[in-house]
Amino acid sequence: MRIILLGAPGAGKGTQAQFIMEKYGIPQISTGDMLRAAVKSGSELGKQAKDIMDAGKLVTDELVIALVKERIAQEDCRNGFLLDGFPRTIPQADAMKEAGIVVDYVLEFDVPDELIVDRIVGRRVHAASGRVYHVKFNPPKVEGKDDVTGEDLTTRKDDQEETVRKRLVEYHQMTAPLIGYYQKEAEAGNTKYAKVDGTQAVADVRAALEKILG
């Protein structure tokens, strides 16, 4: 089962990716992890990636596709894989197709921007333990304080409204066009496309995914 997850940051992909990996026994492939592993292994592709990154440049789509092909040929991908955060653009999706990488399901997590902002901006963190709260959905017993230690909770820089809105704009400009791309691919019979209502409770989203993936 070869799956691509699409959806804005904060749409709940990470939580459900974990569930899909455990339920279907497939690894999650993140391009960041893959690049780091390739550089560490010192493979030919890894050396190329290191040279580009050391020069402060972005790794080319061709190189990332070559790394994806190398990664999905490994034993743990025998039953499939889960791609999250790639492809990000239509040229990357085209390059994947040209490289012969077949995808069985493209799952879009649909959540309105305002709810995403609400979800992320309301997060509060106890830095020392990693405990995460939410002012609305999972508040601490005492406002602004960790339940266990009573220490102050903080907001991560990534969770500030300005940062979240900027990431959403980037997502809509770069990645959202992939939705139309993969819907057309599904119409042509090259993959299956499903939109998942990400506003539901975690268990309901999970049930919807099980229904789609079988």
UniProtKB/Swiss-Prot annotation:
A biological-process GO annotation = AMP salvage
Show the Gene3D superfamilies listed in the entry. P-loop containing nucleotide triphosphate hydrolases (3.40.50.300)
Q: Which domain of life is it from?
A: Bacteria
List locations, semicolon-separated: Cytoplasm
Q: Where is this region: LID?
A: 122-159
**What is any one of the record's Gene Ontology cellular component terms?**
cytosol
Q: Where does AMP bind?
A: 31, 36, 57-59, 85-88, 92, 156, 167
Q: What is its main location?
A: cytoplasm
Which InterPro entries does its entry note?
A: Adenyl_kin_sub (IPR006259), Adenylat/UMP-CMP_kin (IPR000850), Adenylat_kinase_CS (IPR033690), Adenylate_kinase_lid-dom (IPR007862), P-loop_NTPase (IPR027417)
**UniProt KW keywords:** ATP-binding, Cytoplasm, Kinase, Nucleotide biosynthesis, Nucleotide-binding, Transferase
Q: Which SUPFAM superfamilies match?
A: P-loop containing nucleoside triphosphate hydrolases
Q: List the residue ranges of the region (NMP).
A: 30-59
| E.C. number | 2.7.4.3
Q: Per its UniProt record, what PROSITE patterns does this chain match?
A: ADENYLATE_KINASE (PS00113)
Q: In which pathway does it act?
A: Purine metabolism; AMP biosynthesis via salvage pathway; AMP from ADP: step 1/1
- From the UniProt record, list the reaction(s) this protein catalyses: AMP + ATP = 2 ADP
Q: Write out the GO MF terms.
A: adenylate kinase activity; ATP binding; nucleoside diphosphate kinase activity
Which residues does the record give as ATP binding sites?
Answer: 10-15, 123, 132-133, 200
Pfam families, alphabetized: ADK, ADK_lid
- Family membership noted in the UniProt record: Belongs to the adenylate kinase family.
- Oligomeric form and interacting partners: Monomer.
Q: Which PANTHER family match?
A: NUCLEOTIDE KINASE
Q: What is the role of this chain?
A: Catalyzes the reversible transfer of the terminal phosphate group between ATP and AMP. Plays an important role in cellular energy homeostasis and in adenine nucleotide metabolism.
Query: What's noted about domains in the record?
Result: Consists of three domains, a large central CORE domain and two small peripheral domains, NMPbind and LID, which undergo movements during catalysis. The LID domain closes over the site of phosphoryl transfer upon ATP binding. Assembling and dissambling the active center during each catalytic cycle provides an effective means to prevent ATP hydrolysis.
User: Mind telling me what this protein is named?
Assistant: Adenylate kinase
Name the source organism: Salmonella typhimurium (strain LT2 / SGSC1412 / ATCC 700720)
